[in-house]
């Protein structure tokens, strides 16, 4: 379980905004995009836009790749 993901690591490593880092954290925790949007209190379209931005900043193109990248980053930098 990755609920103790420190979003500051994601912000620092990938230059994510706080909102993007929170979305990435929920996705890494196993939530889907709709669940993550609901948890964050944002519209699905907002979450999709943030996800596209996260993909651009991290260089990945799929949620599964993003989760893998986040988990590897946490192992490396925690």
Model regions and ranges:
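The N-cap/first-turn positions of alpha helices
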Residues: 19-23
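Regulatory hinge/linker segments at domain boundaries
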Residues: 1-18
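Basic, Lys/Arg-enriched C-terminal extension of HTH/homeodomain DNA-binding domains
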Residues: 8, 13, 52-78
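Recognition helix of helix-turn-helix DNA-binding domains
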Residues: 30-65
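Short helix-to-turn junction characteristic of helix-turn-helix DNA-binding domains
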Residues: 27-31, 70
């Amino acid at each position: 379980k990755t609920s103790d993901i420190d979003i500051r690591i994601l912000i620092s490593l990938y230059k994510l905004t706080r909102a993007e880092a929170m979305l990435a954290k929920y996705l890494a925790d196993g939530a889907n995009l709709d669940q993550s949007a609901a948890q964050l209190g944002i519209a699905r379209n907002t979450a999709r836009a943030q996800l596209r931005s996260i993909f651009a900043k991290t260089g990945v193109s799929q949620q599964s790749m993003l989760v893998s990248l986040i988990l590897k980053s946490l192992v490396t930098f925690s």
